[in-house]
Amino acid sequence: MAFYAYAAKAVEVAVNVDTGEVQVLRCYGATDLGKAINPKICEQQSEGGMAMGIGSALYEETVIVNGLILNPSFTDYRVPLAAQMPANECMQSIFVESAPHKDGPFGAKGFAEGVVTGMEPAIANAVYNAVGARIKELPVTPEKILQALRGGS
């Protein structure tokens, strides 16, 4: 049995062209749920997933050199701080309750993965739309943005 749920993301960013820093100002996540059993929990799951996607897009990277992980702990592994997240009122979850899924509990579909995926390309494309820097490798770092703005690859 498969639960095919669809999702889409949109983000608004501000990019500092002097430093390459990106701030996600607003983000929207639309998800097909089938039937939302508990809409508040669905909203919290969606916003948590968008936050995870922001971390994946802008900060998180496992650095490996000669087979050795150079950032094996949260001391060295970058994750976003609360101050680097959009304000709660700037994260919006949009739920599409399609026909109840015949095999899902009470007609619901699984949607946990869909709330994370899509943030990375949405952020990379928002950076491109804002300043013309096309970043093709995650994370989208200030260094990569500045290099792209200077004409590097």
Label each PLM-derived region with a short phrase.
Residues 1-153:
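C-terminal catalytic domains of large/alpha subunits in multi-subunit enzymes
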